[in-house]
């Protein structure tokens, strides 16, 4: 076993390289800047490109262009930057452009505090696009998760032709720990699915029985079209209601139909439990300690750590909630993902504890909330 001492941001950079990333563009912003610095060291020696845009809008635009040309691309930012990314995120969704977007969250709103963490962007990542179509949001807990989930993020972006978010935060980004990268069983790398040379279809036309069209790279052997406007299979702008509805439903269904294939989680079940504790992100560290303390106090409790937030893994959550008398949700915000839990916990009381003051939620705070 060979241990590597790294933080979450380095885990993301290494995961990106292992997944085949060959293009990175970003604009410096705390606490995401070290991802850019890592990629600047890692990409050029392999023939990849790492560049700093003049601002966040340009940076994500560079990534979209690189991806449309056929290469795997990633960008990274924090709260103020993700707000500026919004229009281009919508373009990536509608244009079915594979892209990994890392949001190393910090305390908001607005500029907020660059050196304080939070999980305040969760709802923005889900709904911060015009049209409200579904997106994939993954939530690492530690540096190992950052490495593995980044690889999964690239695979999902390629497989489903969509932007994929990694919802990290300042504490995950800057916490250094020993990780056995060789022993953490990374997923098999998914390559881009280009349209075959004899493919007679259009740029946005899936093959028979499929929901995701093969990829027509810009500058490739086939004529390709791209637009941010509503379009039909040919890539031409359309105002035809039937064509628009068919396209929108396909964009929605391609993710919802595959959610069980990218549901990542840890579940610590106690026999005859009555309470389910639900957490995600760095708060999972405190929750693990709190669950140990609660069980020593005689509390029958299980712990669900969600590592894929959207599309909501409804089957998993409903199964975990089944036969519980109470659900407790803990978040580093004032209540964002708890709304999804409440929607699924029909007939089961849901309690919430949120904290957004720049400090980590402590195990003691969780114990106090559960036993109140």
Please describe what each predicted stretch is.
Residues 2-9, 158-372:
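Flexible, low-complexity linker and terminal segments
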Residues 116-169, 194-196:
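Conserved thiamine diphosphate
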Residues 1-127, 134, 151, 170, ...:
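Thiamine diphosphate
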Residues 18, 70, 95-96, 132, ...:
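Short, well-ordered loop/turn elements at secondary-structure boundaries
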Residues 31-34, 60, 82-84, 108-111, ...:
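Flexible loop/turn segments at secondary-structure boundaries
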Residues 14, 86, 144-147, 151, ...:
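Amphipathic, non-transmembrane alpha-helical secondary structure
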């Amino acid at each position: 076993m060979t241990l590597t001492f790294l933080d979450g941001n380095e885990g993301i950079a290494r995961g990106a390289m292992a997944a085949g990333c060959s293009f990175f563009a970003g604009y410096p912003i705390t606490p995401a800047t070290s991802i850019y610095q890592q990629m600047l060291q890692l990409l050029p020696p392999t023939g990849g490109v790492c560049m700093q845009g003049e601002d966040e809008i340009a940076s994500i635009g560079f990534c979209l262009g690189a991806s449309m040309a056929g290469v795997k691309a990633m960008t990274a930012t924090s709260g103020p930057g993700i707000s500026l990314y919004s229009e281009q995120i919508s373009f990536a969704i509608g244009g079915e452009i594979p892209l990994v977007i890392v949001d190393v969250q910090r305390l908001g709103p607005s500029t907020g505090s660059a050196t304080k963490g939070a999980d305040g962007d969760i709802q923005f990542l889900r709904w911060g696009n015009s049209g409200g179509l579904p997106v994939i949001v993954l939530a690492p807990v530690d540096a190992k998760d950052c490495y593995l989930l980044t690889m999964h993020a690239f695979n999902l972006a390629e497989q489903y032709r969509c932007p994929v978010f990694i919802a990290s935060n300042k504490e995950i980004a800057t916490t250094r720990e020993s990780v056995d990268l060789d022993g953490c069983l990374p997923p098999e790398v998914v390559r881009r699915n280009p349209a075959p040379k004899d493919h007679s279809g259009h740029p946005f036309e899936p093959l028979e029985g499929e929901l995701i069209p093969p990829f027509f790279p810009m500058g490739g052997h086939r004529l390709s079209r791209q637009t941010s406007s509503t379009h039909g299979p040919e890539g031409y702008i359309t105002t035809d209601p039937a064509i628009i509805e068919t396209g929108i439903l396909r964009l929605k269904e391609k993710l919802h139909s595959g959610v069980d294939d990218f549901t990542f989680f840890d579940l610590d079940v106690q026999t005859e439990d009555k309470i389910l504790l639900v957490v995600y992100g760095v708060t999972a560290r405190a929750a693990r300690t709190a669950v140990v303390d609660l069980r020593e106090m005689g509390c029958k409790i299980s712990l669900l750590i969600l590592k894929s937030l959207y599309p909501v893994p409804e089957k998993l959550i409903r199964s975990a909630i089944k036969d519980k008398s109470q659900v407790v949700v803990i978040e580093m915000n004032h209540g964002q993902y708890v709304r999804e839990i409440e929607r699924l916990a029909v007939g089961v009381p849901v309690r919430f504890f949120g904290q957004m003051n720049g400090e980590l939620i402590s195990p003691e705070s969780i114990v106090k909330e559960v036993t109140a």
